[in-house]
Amino acid sequence: MTGSLFIITAASGTGKTSLVKQLLATTNDLTVSVSHTTREPRPGEIDGHHYHFTDVNKFVTAISESQFLEHAEVFGNYYGTSEQSVRAQLDAGVDVILEIDWQGALQVKKIFTDAIMIFILPPSIATLRQRLSTRGQDSMEVIEQRLAGAVNEMAQYVNFDYVIINDSFEVALTELKAIIVADRQTLKRQQQRYQRTITNLLSNTVDE
């Protein structure tokens, strides 16, 4: 059985990473693709778990060798998704989440046309500013850069299949789970999962 590809995008500070983390903790057969990046690790980040940290030269070489499903430059740092890794997980029947920006999302959609695209929005710019400041990961200069680009990022929601407003974490998480569950009940997925059962039902045979 082939897994589904879910692309989740949001402006920085919207709560995407926290939602995905909780979703993974409560959902079976679901994983998140670990991106490659040239940025420096933040406190507490582990190489190979949060990101595959690399340098610019190695990243550029990987681009030239077409190793990335998508890649983009964000605030002076490069980010990319390994195509080989994603395809291997999907072929193993695992649903895969890509946490990437809207540029990368549109790149991936051209290759995986069945990918399910989800955009998460904050309830307001004021809330977004507060969340960016509270998490204490970036300087005020970086926060202002992120806010300046947030409106343009959020305007891309029209290119996505689903939109979630993260005003209440629990409500947003429930809505995110609902999208995953609904996809797993589609005709294509159920035919793959229950092929033998359906065959037996339609042939009037009893499975011993």
UniProtKB/Swiss-Prot annotation:
Its Enzyme Commission number(s) read 2.7.4.8
PROSITE patterns, per database record = GUANYLATE_KINASE_1, GUANYLATE_KINASE_2
- Example GO molecular function: ATP binding
Q: Where in the cell is it found?
A: Cytoplasm
Q: Which domain of life is it from?
A: Bacteria
Give the residues the record marks as binding ATP.
10-17
Q: Which InterPro entries match?
A: GK/Ca_channel_bsu, Guanylate_kin-like_dom, Guanylate_kinase, Guanylate_kinase_CS, P-loop_NTPase
The record lists the catalysed reaction(s) as:
GMP + ATP = GDP + ADP
CDD domains found in the cross-reference section:
GMPK
Xref: SMART domains:
GuKc
Question: What range(s) does the Guanylate kinase-like domain occupy?
Answer: 3-181
Pfam families membership: Guanylate_kin
Question: What do the Gene Ontology cellular component annotations say?
Answer: cytosol
Q: Mind listing the UniProt keywords for this protein, alphabetically?
A: ATP-binding, Cytoplasm, Kinase, Nucleotide-binding, Transferase
Q: NCBIfam families, from UniProt?
A: guanyl_kin
Family per record: Belongs to the guanylate kinase family.
Per the entry, what this protein does is: Essential for recycling GMP and indirectly, cGMP.
| Designated name of the protein | Guanylate kinase
Q: What organism does the UniProt record list as the source?
A: Psychrobacter cryohalolentis (strain ATCC BAA-1226 / DSM 17306 / VKM B-2378 / K5)
Name the lineage: Bacteria, Pseudomonadati, Pseudomonadota, Gammaproteobacteria, Moraxellales
Q: Which gene encodes it?
A: gmk
